[in-house]
UniProtKB/Swiss-Prot annotation:
Substrate-specific adapter of a BCR (BTB-CUL3-RBX1) E3 ubiquitin ligase complex that acts as a regulator of ion transport in the distal nephron. The BCR(KLHL3) complex acts by mediating ubiquitination and degradation of WNK1 and WNK4, two activators of Na-Cl cotransporter SLC12A3/NCC in distal convoluted tubule cells of kidney, thereby regulating NaCl reabsorption. The BCR(KLHL3) complex also mediates ubiquitination and degradation of WNK3. InterPro entries: BACK, BTB-kelch_protein, BTB/POZ_dom, Kelch-typ_b-propeller, Kelch_1, KLHL3_BACK, SKP1/BTB/POZ_sf. This is Kelch-like protein 3. It is linked to Pseudohypoaldosteronism 2D: A disorder characterized by severe hypertension, hyperkalemia, hyperchloremia, hyperchloremic metabolic acidosis, and correction of physiologic abnormalities by thiazide diuretics. PHA2D inheritance is autosomal dominant or recessive. The lineage of its organism: Eukaryota, Metazoa, Chordata, Craniata, Vertebrata. GO terms for cellular component: Cul3-RING ubiquitin ligase complex; cytoplasm; cytoskeleton; cytosol. It comes from Homo sapiens. Kelch repeats lie at residues 302-347, 348-394, 396-441, 442-490, 491-537, 539-585. Changing S433 to A/N: Abolished phosphorylation by PKC, promoting ubiquitination and degradation of WNK4. GO terms for biological process: distal tubule morphogenesis; gene expression; macroautophagy; monoatomic ion homeostasis; potassium ion homeostasis; proteasome-mediated ubiquitin-dependent protein catabolic process; protein K48-linked ubiquitination; protein ubiquitination.
Length: 587
């Protein structure tokens, strides 16, 4: 207001006007309330001026009615109404354990409470009973922050029971967005039929392929096969079989015993087969729930850059937020690691093998982005550095590399379902510093260094998991060891690398349909031993070295414009031989 000075403080303030006689002093002391409650709590601890005892189980708590009534509508109604408790000196609270009630009454006096994994499930309903809505909301916020593929369905059920509407929606959205990881957990396998149907029928389900939904149904049925077998048809009604590749329908769905033994399921399969026989324009005319593509909510992504040389092996891990154009440090590796294979699989980032500064290793560390934590899993059969790593059909492949004495042609695969490594067919050529990528169900090993001939390689091999065989495909136009290899729009990119002392900035692209390579625009900088990933239709090349120094810069390729652009912000550390993966941003 004009002519008035307003400031929230414990100072004396003056309202000035035309008439000096209208002066007045307003004192606002924000610490007053806190001091008053502190004194009241001290009185309570000494059992002074207390006029009520609150009892739960065998815990007795002395308190002041006016304080409880001022902070809790539950107590206010109790003490001001016509109930017998309004005058009782001792009041028993049922459905709340003594320790929890004590914490909540402490909160009433102090405005402080600690919410933990251990107490949140008893604290929230107790806070709801006492109508301490701030505590209830804090519990909901805590549970939301703890959402993880292994617990989101349990949190969803808890939120439903206690009518926590926002938390229920958040947990349900999380389950939909992380379905490939959620379906692997005990919580999913323990869902009721209606709960499974509700989840897999959602248009918002985030799956790279409808294969995941089919696998989830089979897993759920087999978990308690005798009692669940009768539900097979009802579940398959929600699997969008027409959207599956024809090869998968023939080789996997048709061969599944649970499908063969159910006539309704066979009808769904026939429907899908007929759909594939139709021309594309006629397919678009078919409108039913099983031919409708899912429309998941797009989750923001971040890029994880793991370890590397700077100039020695490091533990540092950096995270790039694409939306905010910002780099952050996240949890370090348990030990130094460079020249490792790094992939994203089943909701986690895997760092496979590599070099720790003194030894080539066969160890594997796994990063959980929700917990910001690394853990160790089963080690590979062989030590490998400068290997290639890729994911195909839910298996992590470790390809070639160097064991400290020789280049490797061997290849091994890891199943996260069994936590075991096993060998598959070896390549035809030993390859260290090899780049790998997966296109249309085939694994490609690109270039590298052949220790036997002591030459960098231009040859490329393709692995077919169905036949467990490697064959040569078209050579690149030039020899490349330490090339950054990535996949974009069904094509395989080989970026940079080196041939002896010559470090390249050229890039070429392989089309599996024509078995040919073609040149595209050069990068802005010569790079070898860089990390590569694809995000939102762009190919990112991260760090590496130019033959004389490690690079902190990142550039990306747009295939529409055939141009490379440098990111405006660099990593905090120049690093080569780092691994790169893309994960969903933890919200």
């Amino acid at each position: 207001m004009e002519g008035e000075s307003v400031k929230l403080s414990s100072q004396t303030l003056i309202q000035a006007g035309d008439d000096e006689k209208n002066q007045r002093t307003i004192t606002v002391n924000p610490a007053h309330m806190g001091k008053a409650f502190k004194v009241m709590n001290e009185l309570r601890s000494k059992q002074l001026l207390c006029d009520v005892m609150i009892v739960a189980e065998d815990v007795e708590i002395e308190a002041h009615r006016v304080v409880l009534a001022a902070c809790s509508p539950y107590f206010c109604a109790m003490f001001t109404g016509d109930m017998s408790e309004s005058k009782a000196k001792k009041i028993e609270i049922k459905d709340v354990d003594g320790q929890t009630l004590s914490k909540l009454i402490d909160y009433i006096y102090t405005a402080e409470i600690e919410v933990t994994e251990e107490n949140v499930q008893v604290l929230l309903p107790a806070a709801s009973l006492l109508q301490l809505m701030d505590v209830r909301q804090n519990c909901c916020d805590f549970l939301q922050s703890q959402l993880h593929p292994t617990n989101c369905l349990g949190i969803r059920a808890f939120a439903d029971v206690h009518t926590c509407t926002d938390l229920l929606q958040q947990a349900n959205a999380y389950a939909e967005q992380h379905f490939p990881e959620v379906m692997l957990g005990e919580e999913f396998l323990s869902l009721s039929l209606d709960q499974v149907c509700s989840l897999i029928s959602s248009d918002k389900l985030t799956v790279s392929s409808e294969e995941k939904v089919f696998e989830a149904v089979i897993s759920w049925i087999n978990y308690e096969k005798e009692t669940r077998l009768e539900h097979m048809a009802k579940l398959m009604e929600h699997v969008r079989l027409p959207l599956l590749p024809r090869d998968y329908l023939v080789q996997t769905v048709e061969e599944e015993a649970l499908i063969k033994n159910n006539n309704t399921c066979k009808d769904f399969l026939i429907e899908a087969m007929k759909y594939h026989l139709l021309p594309l324009d006629q397919r678009l005319l078919i409108k039913n729930p099983r031919t409708k593509p899912r429309t998941p909510v797009s989750l923001p992504k971040v890029m994880i850059v793991v370890g590397g040389q700077a100039p020695k092996a490091i533990r540092s891990v950096e995270c790039y937020d694409f939306e905010e154009d910002r780099w952050d440090q996240i949890a370090e590796l348990p030990s130094r690691r460079c020249r490792a294979g790094v992939v994203f699989m089943a909701g986690h980032v895997y760092a496979v093998g590599g070099f720790n500064g003194s030894l080539r290793v066969r160890t594997v560390d796994v990063y959980d982005g929700v917990k910001d934590q690394w853990t160790s899993i089963a080690s590979m059969q062989e030590r490998r550095s400068t290997l290639g790593a890729a994911v195909l059909n839910d298996l992590l492949y470790a390809v070639g590399g160097f064991d400290g004495s020789t280049g490797l042609a061997s290849v091994e695969a890891y199943s996260y379902k069994t936590n075991e490594w096993f060998f598959v067919a070896p390549m035809n050529t030993r390859r260290s510093s090899v780049g790998v990528g997966v296109v249309e169900g085939k694994l490609y090993a690109v270039g590298g260094y052949d220790g036997a001939s002591r030459q960098c390689l231009s040859t490329v091999e393709q692995y077919n998991p169905a036949t467990n065989e490697w064959i040569y495909v078209a050579d690149m136009s030039t020899r490349r060891s330490g090339a950054g290899v990535g996949v974009l729009s069904g094509q395989l990119y080989a970026t940079g690398g080196h041939d002896g002392p010559l470090v390249r900035k050229s890039v070429e692209v392989y089309d599996p349909g024509t078995n040919t390579w073609k040149q595209v625009a050069d990068m802005n900088m010569c790079r070898r031993n860089a990390g590569v990933c694809a995000v939102n239709g762009l190919l990112y090349v991260v760090g590496g070295d130019d033959g004389s120094c490690n690079l902190a810069s990142v550039e990306y390729y747009n295939p529409v414009t055939d141009k490379w652009t440098l990111l405006p912000t660099n990593m905090s550390t120049g690093r080569s031989y780092a691994g790169v993966a893309v994960i969903h941003k933890s919200l």
